[in-house]
From Swiss-Prot:
Similarity annotation: Belongs to the 'phage' integrase family. XerC subfamily.
Organism: Chlamydia caviae (strain ATCC VR-813 / DSM 19441 / 03DC25 / GPIC)
UniProt-recorded name of the protein: Tyrosine recombinase XerC
UniProt-listed PROSITE patterns: CB, TYR_RECOMBINASE
Role noted for this protein: Site-specific tyrosine recombinase, which acts by catalyzing the cutting and rejoining of the recombining DNA molecules. The XerC-XerD complex is essential to convert dimers of the bacterial chromosome into monomers to permit their segregation at cell division. It also contributes to the segregational stability of plasmids.
Disulfide links within the chain: none
Keywords: Cell cycle, Cell division, Chromosome partition, Cytoplasm, DNA integration, DNA recombination, DNA-binding
Domain of life: Bacteria
UniProt GO cellular component terms: cytoplasm
InterPro entries: CB, DNA_brk_join_enz, Integrase-like_cat_sf, Integrase_catalytic, Integrase_recombinase_N, Integrase_SAM-like_N, Tyrosine_recombinase_XerC/XerD, Tyrosine_recombinase_XerCD
Lineage: Bacteria, Pseudomonadati, Chlamydiota, Chlamydiia, Chlamydiales
Length: 312
């Protein structure tokens, strides 16, 4: 079964082109399930599954342990350990994906996860921030430093185009057309879309592109956003930078790069953009996903009404 885990991860990496973040989560989730099965089968713990491992020493973990009962007991154990509902849902989803892979490749012939469902997640509305808070965040990076100038450009692009963090780090030089202010984005499922950026954001990006220190550090000839060593920025490094600027600006630590995506989508809607256009810009496969912003917009309107009404 260990070899099947590795084959599945290789499939995700090479065929589905999953991001490093996604692969890392799959490794965490499958290792958790593997440890549970080893405990159930009274087997000695084996080395964690890791794609970085060059020599894969595969200990025996029989598929006979992978049953409906074992999956059900695993979910029950996670609940008893008070794991977050979202964590349980994600781990079960990873096992279901692994099971489907095994069936497709005729490793197993029945799906042990078919009738097992994770906990229901409460529908959480995104919490956008105000335009004033966006401005405060934008003003935080130190523009006298190359990295600060780059980070201001990142923030401008987040708010200009509503991109995912993984989409921003994947941008190459030739993806940006400054004549039309369009960026070719590779989104989820390798789907490409053209996303406009504001002239204001385009101006910042052009200045960054010609920044003298950028030319000095450049080692990756493809990547647009570079770290101080000239390599492509990672999602993790942007996350760290983002949290640093939140601390410096005094804004809430619960704000994330994805919050900016929610924010601009809400602002687009409030300024009259239709849902189909917002769906296309954000790269949502379903209009239902985009519809959540109508609820957010109404929630904000009700809040403003209550705060402004003389009888409130």
């Amino acid at each position: 079964m260990i070899s099947a885990f590795y084959a599945f991860l290789d499939y995700l990496k090479n065929i589905k082109t999953a991001s490093p973040h996604t692969l890392r989560n799959y490794c965490i989730d499958l290792n958790s399930f593997k440890s549970f099965l080893e405990k159930q089968g009274e087997l000695s713990p084996s080395s964690p599954i890791c794609l970085l491992t060059k020599e894969r020493k595969e200990t025996e973990l029989p598929f006979s342990l992978f049953t409906k009962d074992s999956v059900r007991l695993y979910v029950l154990e996670l609940m008893q350990e008070n794991k977050a509902k979202r964590t349980i849902k994600r781990r079960l989803s990873a096992i279901k994906s692994f099971s489907q892979y095994c069936i497709k490749n005729r490793i197993i012939f029945e799906d042990p996860t078919e009738t097992i469902h994770g906990p229901r997640l409460p529908k959480e509305l995104p919490s956008p921030i105000t335009y004033e808070q966006v401005e405060i965040l934008m003003a935080t990076p130190d523009l006298s430093k190359y990295t600060g100038f780059r980070d201001r450009c990142l923030l401008e692009l987040f708010y200009s185009s509503g991109l995912r963090i993984s989409e921003i780090v994947a941008i190459n030089h030739w993806d940006i057309d400054f004549n039309s202010n369009l960026i070719r984005i590779r989104g989820k499922g390798k789907k490409e879309r053209l996303v406009p950026m504001t002239p204001h954001a385009a101006q910042w990006l052009q200045q960054y592109l010609h920044h003298p220190e950028r030319a000095h550090v450049e080692q990756d000839p493809q990547a647009f956003f570079l770290n101080r060593f000239g390599k492509r920025l990672t999602t993790r490094s942007i996350d760290r930078k983002f949290q640093k600027y939140l601390r410096q600006s005094g804004l809430s630590g619960s704000i994330t790069p994805h919050t900016i995506r929610h924010t601009i989508a809400t602002h687009w809607l409030e300024n009259g953009m239709d849902l189909k256009t917002i769906q296309a810009l954000l790269g949502h496969s379903s209009l239902e996903t985009t519809t959540i912003y109508t609820h957010v917009s109404m929630k904000l309107k009700k809040q403003t009404h209550e705060e402004s009404h003389p009888h409130s």
